């Protein structure tokens, strides 16, 4: 490229200061420099004013021409000398053929101790090599580092906000338990603080749509809802159908675009036509649930604005409206532990649901019904058999029907439950059979596949995960992971297999990891150690059977196979069964 003072040599050759200030574009994204000798201020993309070049800022009293004026002149009178391998042309007119090399006037090679020629015609006092080497050092080590630093800063600035959200995944204030990415909609994730404004899902098929359950009604999505909220939405809201339409007509029309979901209880397609409560006449509105979200998106793209039996229909993603928007109740509702408000809430009636109350299994309705009702008072959907209490004790079934119709999970889920001995479920999850806030062997939890426990109790479950534990208790589960747990004996942890935050055989993550306690550990495979405790033998930060921070016989350390520990009997920094200075030190140099 022409007139380019390029760093094509990746720091091998430095562009020395050009006597005539040609504003060559510098190849590492640096702004082109032009110099004060021609009335142009030095411009640098790094905010540097190369003050060391004060001796180069020639006062060109006799030459007020612009830089372009020099391009048209033969520069033979300037005693240019190409140095070593730079190979610049003497003539700027031919500089276009130099392939990225800059035309340089009296330009020494990188590291060459030459002083510049005194140009009597230009009254230039050129700096010696001392100044030049200082410039080279700055230009080489600082300018390029500046570029890297600024590019990193720019990169970080783009991601800082998102990263902050990710950091709060299990965060102090973030009660989006089980939620991927800080209470998103993964594995039953709730809104960011778990109490969010009516958009959080209560669990479901790994963050499935907020369809099935809760005390809400459907409506069109508002402008405040972002497009990303619909990535798992498989239900559409249709308006303008007309009064004399039937579910069969709606089904025939929309099944052209995808498979309409079937209610497993009734065997009917999941299509709900709305009627006016006062007149009983159809409102011309309906919801249609497809088997998969892409079909719903395709139905919106294709049918929105199309004609249906002589009427132009409007098709959009369905969203639920809270009870107070439908003219409902007092807006009571408790908000503890993320609150019911974010999950479809019960604020319409105020307070907690009573024993025996049940959620309509119709995904287009989701109305909460009194225990005495045998059909939904909104859509007349028959009451599921498994929602009926047995023996006067309704404790074991949670708030929802079979698997909550929340796509493998739900508000209560199969075998759900709020508490008590062997209390069944929890807020969601497939066979989230533990759950409950407390009680002996409280199996389930807020969500996840077969999520074991709950807030506490023996063999307590957890917020999510596979057979996850709970906040405490023997063999407690945890936020996620297999048999995880927050604390207690054999407690699980935030994630991992049999992880745990504390307690006996606890773990923060990993396989049988533990944060502290007996056989605790920070992570790793069977990392039995941890921050302290008796036989804190394995753990450490990671590795297979790696050590731990302290405790008696704390075998481990930061990593490695059966690595040592930070302190305690048989301790050590790392290595295979290693102490700090034992005879196996030759094994410590191998990579972990």
From Swiss-Prot:
Family matches, as Pfam families: RRM_1
Subcellular location: Nucleus; Cytoplasm
Modified residues (Phosphoserine): 226, 231, 375, 423, 433, 438, 442, 451, 554
Chief localization: nucleus
A GO biological process held by the record: RNA splicing
Post-translational modification Dimethylated arginine, affected residues: 483
Zinc finger boundaries on the chain: RanBP2-type: 354-385
Gene3D superfamilies with a match to the protein in the record: 3.30.70.330, Zinc finger, RanBP2-type (4.10.1060.10)
InterPro entries membership: Nucleotide-bd_a/b_plait_sf, RBD_domain_sf, RRM_dom, TET_fam, Znf_RanBP2, Znf_RanBP2_sf
SUPFAM superfamilies: Ran binding protein zinc finger-like, RNA-binding domain, RBD
Keyword rRNA-binding listed: no
Ranges for region Disordered: 1-237, 324-356, 373-592
Segments forming domain RRM: 234-320
Positions of modified residues (Asymmetric dimethylarginine): 206, 528, 535, 570
Biased composition regions of type Basic and acidic residues, renumbered to the chain: 151-175, 214-224, 579-592
Superkingdom to which the source organism belongs: Eukaryota
Disease / disorder: A chromosomal aberration involving TAF15/TAF2N is found in a form of extraskeletal myxoid chondrosarcomas (EMC). Translocation t(9;17)(q22;q11) with NR4A3.
Similarity section: Belongs to the RRM TET family.
Biological role: RNA and ssDNA-binding protein that may play specific roles during transcription initiation at distinct promoters. Binds to ssRNA containing the consensus sequence 5'-AGGUAA-3'. Can enter the preinitiation complex together with the RNA polymerase II (Pol II).
Subunit structure, interactors included: Belongs to the RNA polymerase II (Pol II) transcriptional multiprotein complex, together with the TATA-binding protein (TBP) and other TBP-associated factors (TAF(II)s). Binds SF1.
Protein name stated in the entry: TATA-binding protein-associated factor 2N
Organism listed in the record: Homo sapiens
């Amino acid at each position: 490229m022409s007139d380019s003072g390029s760093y094509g040599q990746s720091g091998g050759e430095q562009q020395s200061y050009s006597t005539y200030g040609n504003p060559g574009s510098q190849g590492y994204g640096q702004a082109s420099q032009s110099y004060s000798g021609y009335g142009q201020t030095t411009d640098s993309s790094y905010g540097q004013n190369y003050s060391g070049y004060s001796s180069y800022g020639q006062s060109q009293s006799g030459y007020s021409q612009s830089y372009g004026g020099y391009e048209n002149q033969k520069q033979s009178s300037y005693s240019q000398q190409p140095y070593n391998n730079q190979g610049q042309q003497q003539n700027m007119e031919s500089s276009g053929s130099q392939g990225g090399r800059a035309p340089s006037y009296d330009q020494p090679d990188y590291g060459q101790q030459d002083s510049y020629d005194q140009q009597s015609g230009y009254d230039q006092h050129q700096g010696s090599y001392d100044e030049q080497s200082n410039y080279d050092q700055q230009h080489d080590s600082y300018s390029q580092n500046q570029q890297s630093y600024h590019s990193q800063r720019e990169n970080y600035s783009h991601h800082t906000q998102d990263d902050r959200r990710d950091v709060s995944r299990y965060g102090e204030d973030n009660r989006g338990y089980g939620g991927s990415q800080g209470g998103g909609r993964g594995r039953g994730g709730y809104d960011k603080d778990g109490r969010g404004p009516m958009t959080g899902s209560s669990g479901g098929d790994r963050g499935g749509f907020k369809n099935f359950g809760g005390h809400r009604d459907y409506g069109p999505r508002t402008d405040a809802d972002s497009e990303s909220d619909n990535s798992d939405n498989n239900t559409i809201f249709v308006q303008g159908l007309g009064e004399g339409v039937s579910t069969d007509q709606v089904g025939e029309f929309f099944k052209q675009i995808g498979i309409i979901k079937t209610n497993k209880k009734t065997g009917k397609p999941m299509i709900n036509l709305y009627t006016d409560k006062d007149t009983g006449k159809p409102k011309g509105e309906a919801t249609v649930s497809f088997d998969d979200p892409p079909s719903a998106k395709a139905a919106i793209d294709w049918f929105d604005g199309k004609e249906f039996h002589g009427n132009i229909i409007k098709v959009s993603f369905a969203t639920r409206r809270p009870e107070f928007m439908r003219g409902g109740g007092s807006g009571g509702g408790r908000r503890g532990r993320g609150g019911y408000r974010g999950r479809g809430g019960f604020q319409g009636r105020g307070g907690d649901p009573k024993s025996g109350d049940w959620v309509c299994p119709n995904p287009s309705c989701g109305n909460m019904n009194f225990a005495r009702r045998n059909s939904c008072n909104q859509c007349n959907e028959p009451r599921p058999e498994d929602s009926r209490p047995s023996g006067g004790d309704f404790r074991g079934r949670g708030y929802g029907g079979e698997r909550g119709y929340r796509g493998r999970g739900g508000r209560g889920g199969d075998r759900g439950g709020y508490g008590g001995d062997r209390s069944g479920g929890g807020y969601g999850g497939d066979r989230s059979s533990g759950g409950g806030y407390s009680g002996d062997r409280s199996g389930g939890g807020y969500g996840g596949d077969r999520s074991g426990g709950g807030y506490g109790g023996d063999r307590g479950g957890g917020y999510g995960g596979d057979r996850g534990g709970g906040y405490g208790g023997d063999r407690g589960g945890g936020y996620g992971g297999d048999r995880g747990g927050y604390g207690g004996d054999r407690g699980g942890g935030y994630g991992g297999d049999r992880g745990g935050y504390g307690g006996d055989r606890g773990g923060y993550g990993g396989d049988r990891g533990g944060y502290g306690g007996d056989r605790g550990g920070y992570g790793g495979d069977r990392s039995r150690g941890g921050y302290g405790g008796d036989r804190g033998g394995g753990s450490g930060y990671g590795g297979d059977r790696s050590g731990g921070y302290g405790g008696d016989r704390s075998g481990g350390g930061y990593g490695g196979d059966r690595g040592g520990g930070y302190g305690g009997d048989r301790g050590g920094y790392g290595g295979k069964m290693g102490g700090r200075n034992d005879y196996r030190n030759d094994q410590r140099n191998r990579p972990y």
